[in-house]
């Protein structure tokens, strides 16, 4: 039932709602729906599939990783958003960088990012991953993981709550909805 409602939202020939642009549309049911056809753009279909099956690669480096585990636990249950944690970068399309990134770990982060298939997205979780955090002036700390990999969503906090990470994932889903895969 949920898939049909989602596909109804993606259709390019929706039900008339009495607005000005619906004047030329027939007042009855949608004729394409009556025949069993659903029309949509390829971009909308791909983005719908991508938002419903985001598989993050966890890159937990410090205390933010504990909150990331809380987000995957039963209270918030990221599975209901289609988010399933994967153990391999080759199986994931989202990387969650959680915690302090040091200079010695930066090449490993880049290598894991490069192993992910396209399209790929990065969520930076916590003050340390966003800009160095408490250890910003330490000689061995990278002042933000965006110096190593491109970041799509920043989740602030020290450590951010599990709810903040869920909100960041929902923001990433909105960002994916706005992307265009097929060039016009």
Curated annotation (Swiss-Prot):
Keywords of this entry: 4Fe-4S, Cell inner membrane, Cell membrane, Iron, Iron-sulfur, Membrane, Metal-binding, NAD, Quinone, Translocase, Transport, Ubiquinone
Main location: membrane
Cofactor binding annotation: Binds 1 [4Fe-4S] cluster.
Cofactor: [4Fe-4S] cluster
UniProt EC number: 7.1.1.-
Enzyme's top EC category: translocase
InterPro entries named in the record: NADH_UbQ_OxRdtase-like_20kDa, NADH_UQ_OxRdtase_20Kd_su
Annotated catalysed reactions: a quinone + NADH + 5 H(+)(in) = a quinol + NAD(+) + 4 H(+)(out)
A GO CC term attached to the entry: respiratory chain complex I
Keyword ATP-binding: no
Cellular compartments annotated: Cell inner membrane
One Pfam family cited in the UniProt record for this chain: Oxidored_q6
Residues annotated to bind [4Fe-4S] cluster: 63-64, 128, 158
Topological relation to the membrane, as annotated: Peripheral membrane protein
Entry keyword NAD: yes
UniProt similarity note: Belongs to the complex I 20 kDa subunit family.
NCBIfam families per the UniProt record, alphabetical: nuoB_fam, PRK06411.1
Oligomer status and interactors: NDH-1 is composed of 14 different subunits. Subunits NuoB, C, D, E, F, and G constitute the peripheral sector of the complex.
PANTHER family in the cross-refs: NADH DEHYDROGENASE, NADH DEHYDROGENASE [UBIQUINONE] IRON-SULFUR PROTEIN 7, MITOCHONDRIAL
Name recorded for this polypeptide: NADH-quinone oxidoreductase subunit B
Organism: Xanthomonas oryzae pv. oryzae (strain KACC10331 / KXO85)
Lineage, uppermost ranks: Bacteria, Pseudomonadati, Pseudomonadota, Gammaproteobacteria, Lysobacterales
């Amino acid at each position: 039932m949920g898939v049909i409602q989602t596909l109804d939202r993606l259709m390019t020939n929706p039900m008339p709602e009495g607005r000005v642009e619906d004047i030329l549309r027939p007042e009855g049911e949608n004729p394409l729906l009556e025949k069993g056809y659903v029309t949509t753009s390829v971009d909308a279909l791909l983005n719908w599939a991508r938002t419903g099956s985001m598989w993050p690669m966890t890159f937990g480096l410090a205390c933010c990783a504990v909150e990331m585990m809380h987000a995957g636990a039963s209270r918030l249950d990221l599975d209901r958003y289609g988010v399933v944690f994967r153990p391999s970068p080759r199986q994931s399309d989202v990387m969650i960088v959680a915690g302090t990134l040091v200079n010695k770990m930066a090449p490993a982060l880049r290598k894991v990012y490069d192993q992910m298939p396209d399209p790929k997205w990065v969520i930076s979780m916590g003050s340390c991953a966003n800009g160095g955090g408490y250890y910003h002036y330490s000689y061995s700390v990278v002042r933000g993981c965006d110096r190593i990999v491109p970041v799509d969503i920043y989740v602030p906090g020290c450590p951010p709550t599990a709810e903040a990470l869920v909100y960041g994932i929902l923001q990433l889903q909105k960002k994916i909805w706005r992307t265009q895969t097929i060039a016009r």
